[in-house]
């Protein structure tokens, strides 16, 4: 695997991190958090590479033995922890391995680096087990915790990390990169809007299969306005894509609320859906949209933590609630 570079919009953050490292002031634990698609994984990978590199400059040299091992996909002084395949939670056994790992001497004589991603996936037992290592990390140990939603982490874990928040990105800061990825300024700006200022997510959403899903969800909502049965529309949607469906629904509800409160189309992240929004705003009340937004966020949270709600029932209940408001 090639060593990852820092995204253009994170250069200032990167320079701050490298100054800490070069000055011997790097904390033993970093919590890098931001919404999916902001680029935190790229920042973390660049930091991992530079920390393990034998001859770092602004970034890892890419040529030393340590960099070569990392590029090959294995480094003895790097431990990655994430949910097992098919699982949503990080359980205690991988964290016990972390505790063993930090008690050993680095094989390359430098840092030992532990990456936990997504950190909010740790269950309570795993998080409590990690606390011991965070409290007594030993010399030349760096923990990098990555999180989309740090509020779902134990407060005691957060308090033992230096937090680095990566907010959504202004268009001008990522314009050139997005045009390079998507081919035109119009496409770049549209998908940047849809993604809420998250450049990597914008590229994901612009992919053909994601465009098709967005179109299908939009069509289902149009059908609901015309009187279609919510259960029938739920059956048309792919329940395996429930997280994406709820994500779109949340984004569209947030648009509806912005429009309902301001009346201005300029506030929309999905300007192409303005006709649907106008119809919905005409029929529903803002407080009703807030209640539906809370419901959608809670269902998505339950899915994320592995509570295993029935996806088909969630879809049906979700669209029944939408239909009731669209026709009220």
Cite the ranges covered by each PLM segment:
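Charged, glycine-rich active-site and insertion segments that engage polyanionic ligands
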Residues: 1-50, 69, 139-142, 148-328
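Clamp-loader machinery-focused feature within the broader ASCE/P-loop NTPase space
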Residues: 2-125
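A short beta-strand motif that forms part of the nucleic acid-binding face
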Residues: 85, 134, 209
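Conserved adenine-binding aromatic site and its adjacent loop/helix in ATP-hydrolyzing domains
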Residues: 100, 132, 155, 159
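Conserved catalytic/switch belt of AAA+ P-loop NTPases
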Residues: 103, 128-145
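Catalytic acidic motif of RecA-like/P-loop NTPases
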Residues: 117-123, 128-135, 151
């Amino acid at each position: 695997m090639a060593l990852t570079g820092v995204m253009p919009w994170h250069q200032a953050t990167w320079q701050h991190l490298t100054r800490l490292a070069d000055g011997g002031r790097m904390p033993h634990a970093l919590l890098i958090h931001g919404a999916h698609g902001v680029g935190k994984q790229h920042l973390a990978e660049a930091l991992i590479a530079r920390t393990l590199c034998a001859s770092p400059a602004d970034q890892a040299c890419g040529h030393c033995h340590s960099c070569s091992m990392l590029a090959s996909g294995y480094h003895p002084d790097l431990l990655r922890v994430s949910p097992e395949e098919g699982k949503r939670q990080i359980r205690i056994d991988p964290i016990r391995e972390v505790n063993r790992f930090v008690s050993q001497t680095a094989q390359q004589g430098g840092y030992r680096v532990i990456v936990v991603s997504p950190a909010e996936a740790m269950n309570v037992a795993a998080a409590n087990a990690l606390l011991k290592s965070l409290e007594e990390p030993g010399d030349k140990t760096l923990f990098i915790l990555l999180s989309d939603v740090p509020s779902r982490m134990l407060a005691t874990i957060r308090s033992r990390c230096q937090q680095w928040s990566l907010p959504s990105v202004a268009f001008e800061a990522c314009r050139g990169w997005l045009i390079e990825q998507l081919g035109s300024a119009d496409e770049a700006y549209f998908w940047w809007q849809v993604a809420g200022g998250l450049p990597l997510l914008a590229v994901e959403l612009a992919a053909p299969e994601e465009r098709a899903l967005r179109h299908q969800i939009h069509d289902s909502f149009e059908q609901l306005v015309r009187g279609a049965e919510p259960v029938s529309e739920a059956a048309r949607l792919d329940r395996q894509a429930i997280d994406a469906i709820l994500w779109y629904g949340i984004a569209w509800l947030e648009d509806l609320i912005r429009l309902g409160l301001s009346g201005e189309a300029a506030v929309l992240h999905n300007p192409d859906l303005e006709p649907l929004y106008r119809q919905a705003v005409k029929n529903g009340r803002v407080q009703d949209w807030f209640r539906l937004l809370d419901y959608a966020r809670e269902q998505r949270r339950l899915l994320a933590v592995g509570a295993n709600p029935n996806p088909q029932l969630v879809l049906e209940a979700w669209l029944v609630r939408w239909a009731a408001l669209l026709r009220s």
